[in-house]
Regions:
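A short hydrophobic/aromatic micro-motif that marks alpha-helical segments and, especially, helix-coil
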Residues: 17, 52, 170-171
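Sec/Tat signal peptide C-region and signal peptidase I cleavage site
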Residues: 18-22
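Alpha-helical segments with a strong preference for the paired helices of cellulosomal dockerin domains
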Residues: 24-56
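Conserved positions within compact, well-structured domain cores
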Residues: 57-256
Length: 256
């Protein structure tokens, strides 16, 4: 009983700092509409239980002065400089691979007649059992798995905010085509035109790029939202889940 009481008192002493840091987490990843997603709450509960972000790595991020306070990584997942493409992932997969096909995508399966169904993140019964999951859970988020729980793939709200709040300039960095994004506060980051992988081919490098979000396109759940960019255009788009695209993560345990 004495041991239990000591633990209880220690836990109470820890609560104020835990709550303070939890508030920082929520401010860093709150959606534009003021709500926090279920997957964000999952990360937060994990933090509250452990009292820290044990696997967080100090990857560099930039404060663009965005209204939400979101901090974006300066490099893609798997890259060490802003102009490097980094690793290519299918949506909801956390390990890079050499070939991206319908058949080897983790969350699709086929019946004996060759019809394709979705095993996770599905909002329509035409595609199989419905789970109504519309955002990647942390264990399926390549940024979270590869960089630690302080990092996530961006939500659709964060993508839209980035598109609408920054000025975009098509340019080169060390010979690599891409967009220089300048935020409201004058800080900037570079998104290389990394192309995409389909099958074993790397397509359209230097011409355009797609960057995954963690948000499902719920009207057609075999598609998800991404950042699309080329020399003349940039916006949020929806695209098939099985392709190999790069990831620019957002920081979720720290704000400006």
């Amino acid at each position: 009983m004495k041991k239990f009481n000591s633990f209880f008192v220690l836990s109470l002493l820890m609560v104020p700092s835990l709550i303070s840091n939890a508030q920082e987490y929520l401010r860093g990843d709150v959606n534009i509409d003021g709500h926090v997603s279920l997957s964000d709450v999952t990360c937060l509960i994990d933090y509250l239980l452990k009292g820290s972000w044990p696997d967080a790595v100090d990857y560099e991020c930039v404060d663009l002065g965005l209204p939400s306070g979101t901090l974006w990584a300066t490099c893609n997942v798997g890259a060490s400089t802003p102009e490097e493409f980094g690793d290519y992932f299918a949506w909801g997969e956390t390990v890079p691979k050499d070939e991206f096909t319908y058949e080897n995508y983790k969350w699709w399966y086929f019946d004996e007649n060759g019809y394709r169904y979705i095993s996770k993140y599905n909002t329509k019964s035409d595609f199989g059992p419905v789970d109504n999951k519309t955002e990647l859970e942390p264990e399926d988020d390549a940024a979270c798995v590869n960089w630690g729980t302080s990092w996530r793939m961006p939500s659709l709200d964060q993508v839209v905010e980035l598109v609408n709040s920054c000025t975009w300039q098509w340019t080169q960095r060390n010979g690599v085509n891409g967009h220089l994004l300048t935020g409201p506060n004058g800080n900037s980051m570079f998104l290389p035109a990394a192309g995409y992988r389909d099958g074993s081919s790397l397509e359209y490098v230097g011409t355009y790029g797609n960057y995954w979000s963690r948000s499902l396109y719920s009207y057609l759940p075999d598609r998800v939202y991404c950042i699309y960019l080329d020399s003349q255009y940039w916006d949020s788009e929806d695209i098939s889940r099985y392709y190999g695209h790069v990831i620019r993560a957002v920081r979720v345990s720290q704000t400006r």
